[in-house]
Amino acid sequence: MAAKPEDKSTDIPDRLVDINQRKTYKRMRFFGKGGFAKCYEIIDVETDDVFAGKIVSKKLMIKHNQKEKTAQEITIHRSLNHPNIVKFHNYFEDSQNIYIVLELCKKRSMMELHKRRKSITEFECRYYIYQIIQGVKYLHDNRIIHRDLKLGNLFLNDLLHVKIGDFGLATRIEYEGERKKTLCGTPNYIAPEILTKKGHSFEVDIWSIGCVMYTLLVGQPPFETKTLKDTYSKIKKCEYRVPSYLRKPAADMVIAMLQPNPESRPAIGQLLNFEFLKGSKVPMFLPSSCLTMAPRIGSNDTIEDSMHRKPLMEMNGIRPDDTRLESTFLKANLHDAITASAQVCRHSEDYRSDIESLYQQLTNLINGKPRILQGNLGDENTDPAAQPLFWISKWVDYSDKYGFGYQLCDEGIGVMFNDTTKLILLPNQINVHFIDKDGKETYMTTTDYCKSLDKKMKLLSYFKRYMIEHLVKAGANNVNIESDQISRMPHLHSWFRTTCAVVMHLTNGSVQLNFSDHMKLILCPRMSAITYMDQEKNFRTYRFSTIVENGVSKDLYQKIRYAQEKLRKMLEKMFT
């Protein structure tokens, strides 16, 4: 007999009432969970302002002796006010729960950025690290040690501004020279003096920033091993390797922060004087496409550099090299298109490895024999943080004459022509990327492009007009519009039709299946997750491990099996 899906949110009311402030919040979509708390998007019913509602169960809090810790977290966090710290708006309680009203960070945390991208460019790292330092400097100036700085506690808002959050382990230094003795932190980021219990202070945050910076640039934490024992051993010995491809300014800064002796580490304010930050202009913004794809060019790169950069293994895109760009480049009117080397595109082996990984993950899911449920799993089994950033919302097949056209969820338009060349119109409706048969990228605008592409540009306009006028958009609407010149949007790598579905593989690694019954699947190998979109355009994202552990509806299971079979055929084609 099929099992019923569980819904564990019954102890949380739909309306959260703050009697003292005379405010009522409506509980909206589930946002995530961790420790003893669940997080929801909540709306102030009077003002329509949207917040994150962190809801802590009193029953669990008392059971695990977390009452004092929660009180200290609230006391510290409510006293803070800085652009790079998650804003604390309010807190209240009832007989069942404590409700903490926080700034909503819709772009999730830097952990999701890391999973999707592995390594990021130095250009991007400079942007993030500078903001992290600003936030931590504010904390240290106010005698607060965070003690749990890690990618998962560094949140991102819609503008990709860094917001430091989760003050559950934070502490305040009461007097000059005080050393804390509590064993706390996250294994991959914990400082050696915490492990040796010699007493610790502000320097533990510097160590953690070093681990964060290393992870962003290299793609994995510096001391990561398969076991906790080995990781702690490496941390105590300060045993890690700086890859040779890291440029000296970046390597010097990481090495300075990862000093085994806390007294040898720079103070937070001194980090701003390192060449990595001082020698290059810190970017003022990044496009949201950087969450899944490397930027096309950094404003400190030269035109020549953008044409000849070498890819870093496991990096989704590019890494700046030693040379620099005149700051006027991005402002210049590009009369001649800038052609980037095929090296900036991910190689076909990388696309294949994504499909191989996805096929293996689906195979493991099926072999796990998940129980079949009568309906979908409850909201609390979903993982909204793993929801795809880009998917295909419209498509039209004119491959009998011209090619396959599609629109991404952010309003970007793409065409894959029958000769395998591609045109992508960015959401700003100005910038155009052309990708030739060999994978070389050419950057143009709708008014300034190669005359040899005249016919294809007209076809792009035709596809765009048809989809806008005749097709209904699939999926959520809350997607930012890209409007800058450094975006590299994911585009269609390959597609094919079957008797009951259209299968589309994007260059960010995801595979989308649009079924004839109007159900859609988006599979992401990097997040190990599947997103299921029903006829009403409702999104549900599940980790593969959650499905194995908790079960799956019959319809979704059948579609997963179908997707696995199509991935197998894709792999066979790639190897022939």
Swiss-Prot record:
Q: Does the keyword DNA damage apply?
A: no
Name a Pfam family for this protein. POLO_box
Show where the POLO box domain sits.
Answer: 391-469, 491-572
InterPro entries in UniProt: Kinase-like_dom_sf, POLO_box_1, POLO_box_2, POLO_box_dom, POLO_box_dom_sf, Prot_kinase_dom, Ser/Thr_kinase_AS
Residue ranges of domain Protein kinase in the record: 25-277
| Signal peptide limits | none
Q: Identify which residues the record assigns to the active site.
A: D148 (proton acceptor)
Residues recorded as bearing Phosphothreonine in the entry:
T182, T186, T302, T323, T328
Query: Where can this protein be found?
Result: Cytoplasm
What Gene Ontology terms for biological process does this UniProt record contain? actomyosin contractile ring assembly; astral microtubule nucleation; attachment of mitotic spindle microtubules to kinetochore; centrosome cycle; embryonic heart tube development; female meiosis II; female meiotic nuclear division; larval somatic muscle development
Q: Which residues carry this modification: Phosphoserine?
A: S299, S306, S327
- Which EC numbers characterise this protein's activity in its record? 2.7.11.21
Annotated protein name in UniProt: Serine/threonine-protein kinase polo
Q: Which organism is it from?
A: Drosophila melanogaster
Gene coding for it: polo
